[in-house]
């Protein structure tokens, strides 16, 4: 907030029942989500600025792994339960790092049933900005959700250079788009894709960290392309 943002996101990205159970943690995801809401509200109140709070609808399981998404009923129960906590406590819902059309449809349906303002952010398949981790085309995904009243469609948690390319696809199918990338760029000199077993490995092993000025160049390009929302994701910092 001190650095100038006008939206912050609740920090409950990994507070999901499947992730906590997989880590052997005894914490309750709903209790952790309540804490995340309270911390976001305190941050906004302490700065006395006009800053919105986005309630996070995170992936229910490990990021970039749509193959680990459970049944539709489990997704519905998860998003419905955190929706109840967000009502009257956040300004909008952000369905983020969405890896498949199935996940997007369920998360957005629950969000739209309970909130007026809903944003949805896709992520891409490793180094291929044209695909979701599910191997579905990003263009098909954007077109599918364009039929709803989602306010903005975004791309997040991908290399800054690939994110810039991905929003060109968003631009073809919606006027309201944006991005919040990682502070990294794709490094083609790293091992070939065949050496990695999962999309998650591809995502993190083909990266070179970039500094603030280099990140700014990518954000500026996104704005020039027409992005109406820009920000930062993995490893970005206030500066």
Language-model-detected regions and their locations in the chain:
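Domain-level signal for soluble alpha/beta catalytic cores
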Residues: 1-239
């Amino acid at each position: 907030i001190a650095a100038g943002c006008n939206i912050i996101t609740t920090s409950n990205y990994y507070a999901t029942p499947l992730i906590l159970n997989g880590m052997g943690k005894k914490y309750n995801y709903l209790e952790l989500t309540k804490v995340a809401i309270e911390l976001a509200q305190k941050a906004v109140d302490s700065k006395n600025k006009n800053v919105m709070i986005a309630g996070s609808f995170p992936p229910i399981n490990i990021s970039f792994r749509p193959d680990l998404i459970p049944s539709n009923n489990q997704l519905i129960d998860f998003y419905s339960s955190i929706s109840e906590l967000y009502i009257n406590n956040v300004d909008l819902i952000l369905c983020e790092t969405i890896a498949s059309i199935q996940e997007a449809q369920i998360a957005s349906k629950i969000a739209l049933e309970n909130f007026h303002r809903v944003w949805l952010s896709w992520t891409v398949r490793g180094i291929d900005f044209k695909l979701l981790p599910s191997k579905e085309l990003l263009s098909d995904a954007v077109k599918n959700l364009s039929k709803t009243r989602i306010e903005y469609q975004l791309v997040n948690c991908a290399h800054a250079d690939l994110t810039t390319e991905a929003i060109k696809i968003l631009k073809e199918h919606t006027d309201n788009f944006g991005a919040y990338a990682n502070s990294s760029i794709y490094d083609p000199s790293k091992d070939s894709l065949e050496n990695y077993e999962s999309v998650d490995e591809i995502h993190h092993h083909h990266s070179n960290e970039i500094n603030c000025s280099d990140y700014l160049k990518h954000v500026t390009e996104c704005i020039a392309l027409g992005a109406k929302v820009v920000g930062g994701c993995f490893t970005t910092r206030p500066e």
